[in-house]
């Protein structure tokens, strides 16, 4: 593996111990990519392939397990307030950007499934800060029915049935099912309602998305609707926006498809990032003292 991998625990402003990880090229990174994982998922193992792939192509890649997810502390996959996830991600990501060796580097968000919503809301918190986002099968919904009708069949949680329908390759599927850091039970009602509320609010404000983005979706995805990505592309105010739909591919574009398909997806992602990493040296300045964390 031609990249350096590091893990670290950090304490957030609420006193919660959060797991963070990074994949770095041995040369100076050409840009920074910040990972936002899906509901019930985690960065260190599940998103390892993404981290290695991007870092081996020269990007500094940073991930964080949300409170209650993966190796972070907190009630298991209980999301009391989605805003806490956005706050933790924003504070951690900006603490990295404030470090001397990373100042002036382009900064990109990368979100898969629910992580797509995390990435967009992190952008919304400080629209001028981010240089772009890669959104893989993002989660938010068109809601034309009552809450109690939606929650029982809302396929955002990686339970057994969803794992079966999200990850096409049977070997990769079983490996994911065996990852004990992934939450595979049904969500608490409060968590489901919070996710639904967040999705509804995000859907109502898609026109406020202004950063460059690349949204990718498998046309055969039965976990998150490809029409969600089409709606984002159509309604976002971004001047630089790209959509790619992959015929026959499922939800797990970077982790559950046959290797040849995964290579196609990563080739598209890297091409998009490379083009936008070369454009200019960014001028947005931040105060390192504001975004310091306690290890």
Task: Locate the predicted segments by residue.
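N-terminal cap/lid segment of alpha/beta-hydrolase-fold proteins
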Residues: 1-28
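Catalytic nucleophile-loop/oxyanion-hole region of alpha/beta-hydrolase
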Residues: 42-45, 70-105, 259-264
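Short alpha-helix in the alpha/beta-hydrolase fold that links the catalytic acid
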Residues: 211, 225-234
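The serine-hydrolase catalytic nucleophile loop
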Residues: 39-51
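Alpha/beta-hydrolase-fold enzymes
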Residues: 108-191
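Catalytic active-site module of serine/aspartate enzymes centered on a nucleophile-bearing elbow/loop
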Residues: 247-295
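Conserved alpha/beta-hydrolase
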Residues: 51-74
């Amino acid at each position: 593996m031609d990249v350096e991998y590091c893990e670290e625990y950090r304490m957030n402003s609420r006193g919660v111990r959060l797991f963070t990880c990074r994949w770095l090229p041995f040369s100076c990174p050409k840009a920074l990519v910040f990972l936002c994982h899906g509901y019930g998922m985690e960065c260190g193992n599940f998103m390892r392939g993404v981290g290695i792939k991007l870092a081996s192509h020269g990007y500094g890649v940073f991930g964080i397990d949300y409170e209650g997810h993966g190796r972070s502390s907190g009630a298991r996959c209980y999301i009391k307030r989605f805003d806490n996830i956005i706050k933790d991600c924003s504070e951690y990501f900006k603490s990295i950007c404030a470090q001397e060796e990373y100042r002036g580097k382009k900064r990109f968000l990368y979100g898969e499934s629910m992580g797509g919503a995390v990435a967009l809301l992190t952008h919304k918190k400080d629209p001028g800060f981010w240089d772009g986002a890669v959104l893989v099968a993002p989660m938010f919904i068109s809601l034309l029915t009552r809450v109690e009708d939606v929650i029982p069949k809302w396929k955002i949680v990686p339970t057994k049935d969803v794992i079966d329908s999200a990850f096409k390759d049977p070997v990769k599927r079983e490996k994911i099912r065996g990852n004990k850091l992934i939450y595979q039970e049904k969500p608490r009602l409060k968590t489901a309602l919070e996710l639904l509320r967040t999705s509804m609010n995000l859907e109502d404000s898609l026109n406020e998305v202004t950063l460059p983005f690349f949204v990718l979706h498998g046309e055969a995805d039965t976990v998150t609707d490809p029409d969600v990505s089409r709606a984002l592309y159509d309604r976002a105010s971004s001047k630089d926006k790209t959509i790619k739909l992959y015929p026959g591919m499922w939800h797990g574009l970077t982790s559950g498809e046959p290797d040849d398909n995964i290579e196609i997806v990563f080739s598209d992602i890297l091409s998009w990032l490379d083009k936008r990493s070369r454009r200019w040296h960014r001028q947005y300045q931040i105060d390192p003292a504001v975004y310091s964390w306690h290890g």
